[in-house]
Amino acid sequence: MKETLARTDFRLPGQKAVYHGKVRDVYTLENDLLVMIATDRISAFDVVLPAGIPYKGQVLNQIAAHYLDATRDIVPNWKIATPDPMVTIGHRCEPFKVEMVIRGYITGSAWRAYAAGERVLCGLPLPEGMRENQRFEHPIITPTTKADEGHDENISRQEIIAQGLVSKEDYEQIERYTYALFERGTQMAAEKGLILVDTKYEFGKKDGKIYLIDEIHTPDSSRYFYAEGYQERFERGEAQKQLSKEFVRQWLIENGFQGKPGQQIPKMTEAYCDSVSERYIELYERVVGKPFEKADLSNLAERIEKNITEYLR
C-alpha cells in the first residue's frame, strides 16, 4: 500500500499546543503562529474513516494555498507560507464560532431537507417547486455552528447575532466577505469549466482585524459540478457529474453507512482508496488548472517535520 499520513505527533520549536481535528493536525506555536498539517485522513458524516487516501493532504493544502493567494485582495487571510506540500504556516486568529456556508444551487443536505418538506433553511424561506441541483436566483448563506466534536448545526443570521456568537457589525462584514469570495470562486471555477455549487468559509480575528482562516475552495469544503452537460442533466433529472467528496458519501450510503449509531463503516480496500486518490488529483488539476506534482511518499512524517523545523529556524 502507498504510504499515507494518518497522524502527526511532532515536537516543534516553540510549540505550545497541538489539536488533532477530523483531517488536520494543528500546532500552536509561540508568536501567535499556527502550523496546519493536512493529513491523508478522510471524514464523512462527521466520522473519520479508517483508511487514509494517498496524496489527499497535499491536494487539499495546495488547492487552499492557491485560493488563499488568489483572494487576498478581497479579504486578509491567515496564510504566511507553505514550507511543505502538506503544510501551511500562518497567523493564529480567534475563530468565530460559526461557519459561513454559501450555496449557489440546492443539493446535498439542503436538498435532502427540502425534499423532506422543509421550506425554511437557516431562517431563509425557500420557494416551492425547486428541483435537485437547481440554481438559486441568488446565492444564499446558510451558516452552521462550529462543533468541536460531533455534528455542526444549522443556525440563522438572527440567532447568531441574538446569541452573541458574532457581533452584528462583525457578522455583516463576514457576510460581505462570504458573498465576494463566492463570486470570485465562481468566476475562477467557470474559467476551468466548473460550477462552484456550494462551499464554506471560516473567519477569525487577530488584533481587532478579521481574517479568512482555514481552507477554501477545496473538495472537502466545497462542491463542484462540471459545467458541460449541467443543463441537460438537470432537465433530465439525472445526477450531476461532480468533483467533491460527495462520491465518498454516496459510496458509504450505498454500503449502509450514514454515521448513525450502530452502523458499521464498510471496508475500504486499497483499490478503493486509490480510486478516491485519483478523484482528488483530478479535482486538483481541474480546479487549479495545472498538472499535480506528486510529492515523494516515503518517510512522509520525517520530511514534513524537517521542512517545518527548517522554516521556523
From Swiss-Prot:
Q: Please name the GO terms of the biological process aspect recorded for this protein, alphabetically.
A: 'de novo' IMP biosynthetic process
Query: What Pfam families does the database record attribute to this sequence?
Result: SAICAR_synt
* Catalytic activity annotation: 5-amino-1-(5-phospho-D-ribosyl)imidazole-4-carboxylate + L-aspartate + ATP = (2S)-2-[5-amino-1-(5-phospho-beta-D-ribosyl)imidazole-4-carboxamido]succinate + ADP + phosphate + 2 H(+)
Q: Which SUPFAM superfamilies match?
A: SAICAR synthase-like (SSF56104)
Keyword list (alphabetical) reads: ATP-binding, Ligase, Nucleotide-binding, Purine biosynthesis
Q: Which organism is it from?
A: Porphyromonas gingivalis (strain ATCC BAA-308 / W83)
Return the protein name. Phosphoribosylaminoimidazole-succinocarboxamide synthase
| Molecular function terms, GO-annotated | ATP binding; phosphoribosylaminoimidazolesuccinocarboxamide synthase activity
Superkingdom: Bacteria
Which PANTHER family does the UniProt entry name for this protein?
PHOSPHORIBOSYLAMINOIMIDAZOLE-SUCCINOCARBOXAMIDE SYNTHASE (PTHR43700:SF1)
| Record-stated family | Belongs to the SAICAR synthetase family.
EC number(s) per UniProt?
6.3.2.6
Q: Which HAMAP family match?
A: SAICAR_synth (MF_00137)
Disulphide bonds annotated for this chain are none
Q: In which pathway is this protein known to take part?
A: Purine metabolism; IMP biosynthesis via de novo pathway; 5-amino-1-(5-phospho-D-ribosyl)imidazole-4-carboxamide from 5-amino-1-(5-phospho-D-ribosyl)imidazole-4-carboxylate: step 1/2
Q: Provide a GO CC annotation, any one.
A: cytoplasm
